[in-house]
């Protein structure tokens, strides 16, 4: 596989942004060690925005010949008050539920979970020189920049926070350099931390990424954040600027079960959630169901996606590209309920291996029922 084919895999949907493609090409050309990582807070049940979006991208990285790593951010979850702020509970959930759920998610999206390295943050944070890296990075970042970066924790700028949360962004940047990561991967909401990593890369004294004497800047790959199924906090949305302002409130949330489908939901739960989903007729710009169709169903194109309808409503229709489906929906030729039903059945089939695994091994879900899921 040549360099351009590997770059195409990195750019493939659900990727929304690569910082930068030029640097990615440079890393390929000089033969630098390609180490990917994506970090997750341990905060509750895995929904499709976490499991399938990240799983799909991990599969792409593997096909491009890049080593993949999932970072189970237990300390970060503790700092951010997840699972009641209990570190031992967070660690137990990370290893007994989250790791297994991500392995299964990667598998259904075409990846090889056995080739993914899972690392618990504690394993590296307890080494003394990790904190040298945190301080080294911190000395190159202003306090105002850190305050602007707390949005990576799902916090709002100006929100009252404890001091530990100001350390979090610098830890996230340190995770990249301490692990020798050349490709930092996350959802678009983690962009601020990755931009800091790129900017400080050549200034670091402790754990810079060096290849043949050159200090390397990491590449940041940001995937699309699936919209939650709930109605937006404001409707109609009048402009792209307005959409950007409320987009964080429109993503899937573990604390709002009807905004998300979880990887182990039953067929009945999936159908009910899609039935209740916000999907206004002819609306193609701010429509969560269409968003899911674009990034889950039509990740690969062409793909055959059949929508079953009674003959009196036009009969079955098959689409091979998202643009075809989007056009029919915009013109009112495709009814929202028919689309919702088809997406529900698609997800039921896609998630069947995960569902069956947890039916055979119920212990992880039993553990989750016993813990306090916060935020």
UniProtKB/Swiss-Prot annotation:
A motif ('KMSKS' region) lies at residues 251-255. It is found in: Cytoplasm. L-tyrosine binds at residues 37, 168, 172, 175, 190. Its main location: cytoplasm. Keywords: Aminoacyl-tRNA synthetase, ATP-binding, Cytoplasm, Ligase, Nucleotide-binding, Protein biosynthesis. InterPro entries: aa-tRNA-synth_Ic, Rossmann-like_a/b/a_fold, Tyr-tRNA-ligase_4, Tyr-tRNA-ligase_arc/euk-type, Tyr-tRNA_synthase. It catalyses: tRNA(Tyr) + L-tyrosine + ATP = L-tyrosyl-tRNA(Tyr) + AMP + diphosphate + H(+). ATP binds at residue 254. Catalyzes the attachment of tyrosine to tRNA(Tyr) in a two-step reaction: tyrosine is first activated by ATP to form Tyr-AMP and then transferred to the acceptor end of tRNA(Tyr). Belongs to the class-I aminoacyl-tRNA synthetase family. TyrS type 4 subfamily. This is Tyrosine--tRNA ligase. It comes from Pyrococcus furiosus (strain ATCC 43587 / DSM 3638 / JCM 8422 / Vc1).
């Amino acid at each position: 596989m040549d360099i351009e084919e590997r770059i195409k895999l990195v750019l493939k949907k659900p990727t929304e942004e690569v910082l930068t493609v030029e640097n990615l090409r440079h890393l390929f050309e000089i033969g630098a060690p390609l180490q990917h990582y994506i970090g997750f807070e341990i905060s509750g049940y895995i929904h499709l925005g976490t499991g399938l979006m990240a799983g799909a991208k991990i599969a792409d990285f593997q096909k491009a010949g890049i080593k993949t790593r999932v970072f189970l951010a237990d300390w970060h979850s503790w700092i951010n008050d997840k699972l009641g702020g209990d570190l031992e509970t967070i660690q137990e959930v990370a290893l007994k539920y989250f790791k297994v759920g991500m392995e299964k998610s990667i598998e259904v999206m075409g990846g090889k979970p056995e080739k993914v390295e899972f690392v618990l943050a504690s394993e590296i944070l307890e080494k003394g020189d990790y904190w040298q890296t945190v301080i080294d990075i911190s000395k190159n970042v202003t306090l105002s920049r850190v305050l602007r970066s707390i949005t990576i924790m799902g916090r709002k700028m100006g929100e009252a926070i404890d001091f530990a949360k100001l350390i979090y962004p610098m830890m996230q940047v340190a995770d990249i350099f301490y692990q020798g990561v050349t490709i930092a991967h996350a959802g678009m909401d983690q962009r601020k931390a990755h931009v800091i990593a790129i900017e400080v890369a050549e200034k670091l004294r402790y754990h810079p990424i060096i290849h043949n004497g050159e200090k390397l800047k990491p590449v940041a790959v940001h995937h699309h954040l699936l919209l939650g199924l709930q109605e937006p906090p404001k409707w109609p949305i009048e402009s792209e600027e307005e959409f950007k302002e409320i987009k964080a409130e429109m993503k899937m949330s573990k604390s709002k079960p009807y905004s998300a489908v979880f990887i182990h939901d039953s067929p009945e739960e999936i159908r009910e959630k899609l039935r209740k989903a916000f999907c206004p007729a002819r609306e193609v710009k701010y429509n969560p169901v269409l968003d899911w169709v674009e990034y889950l169903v039509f990740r690969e194109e062409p793909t055959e996606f059949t929508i079953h309808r009674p003959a009196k409503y036009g009969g079955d229709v098959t689409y091979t590209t998202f643009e075809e489906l989007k056009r029919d929906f915009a013109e009112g030729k495709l009814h929202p309920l028919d689309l919702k039903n088809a997406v529900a059945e698609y997800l039921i089939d896609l998630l069947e291996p995960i569902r069956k695994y947890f039916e055979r091994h119920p212990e992880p879900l039993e553990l989750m029922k016993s813990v306090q899921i916060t935020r």
